Amino acid sequence: MELEVFAGQEKSELSMIEVARAILELRGRDHEMHFSDLVNEIQNYLGTSNSDIREALPLFYTELNFDGSFISLGDNKWGLRSWYGVDEIDEEIIALEENDDDEVAPKAKKKRVNAFMDGDSDAIDYNADDPEDEDAYEADPALSYDDENPDDEKNEVEAYDAEINEIAPDDLGEDVDLNEDDDEFSDDDAETSEE
């Protein structure tokens, strides 16, 4: 493979980043490369030995990440940032992640073993019915509180009033009703209550 960009230059003077950029530009937008394939192409172009490539690999990977012209597309696939608009970058990465999610099988839950219960058939295993261990736990809709439902607030106020009436002294002889309009306490009220 010959890269016209480097015509007339010594291959030994080229950096791996420069060669990687040229290789990706030559391949084009829809031909992203896996990291290992990119390294193999660079090695073939530069004609370096396996030991030299292995020695330069950590620095090359670091430069690939820090150089602003490359972008990781997930799955260790690399492309040029100039190929993608800002919105497309997120779409490409999300599409790759969705493909990965389809391939991953759900993990099986590990069963806990209690060493003290092995020989005892009469023992009760309290871990067997723990509702927090269930993945498909659904809340009871009757127990949920809806901010939008005015009946919930009305029920709360009625329950609160009933509790206050239970606590009120019996010598009052009547239910205590709270008047929300009398929230302010004036000085005149203070004098009459002291007398």
Swiss-Prot record:
One CC-aspect GO term: DNA-directed RNA polymerase complex
Keyword terms: DNA-directed RNA polymerase, Nucleotidyltransferase, Transcription, Transferase
Gene3D superfamilies with a match to the protein in the record: RNA polymerase, subunit delta, N-terminal domain
KW Secreted (keyword) present: no
Acidic residues: bias regions: 120-138, 145-195
Keyword Cell cycle: no
Gene Ontology molecular functions: DNA-directed RNA polymerase activity
Location of the HTH HARE-type domain: 14-83
GO BP terms: DNA-templated transcription; regulation of DNA-templated transcription
Record-linked Pfam families: HARE-HTH
Segments for region (Disordered): 120-195
Family membership noted in the UniProt record: Belongs to the RpoE family.
Subunit structure comment from the entry: RNAP is composed of a core of 2 alpha, a beta and a beta' subunits. The core is associated with a delta subunit and one of several sigma factors.
Function: Participates in both the initiation and recycling phases of transcription. In the presence of the delta subunit, RNAP displays an increased specificity of transcription, a decreased affinity for nucleic acids, and an increased efficiency of RNA synthesis because of enhanced recycling.
Protein name per its UniProtKB record: Probable DNA-directed RNA polymerase subunit delta
Organism: Streptococcus pneumoniae serotype 2 (strain D39 / NCTC 7466)
Gene that produces this protein: rpoE
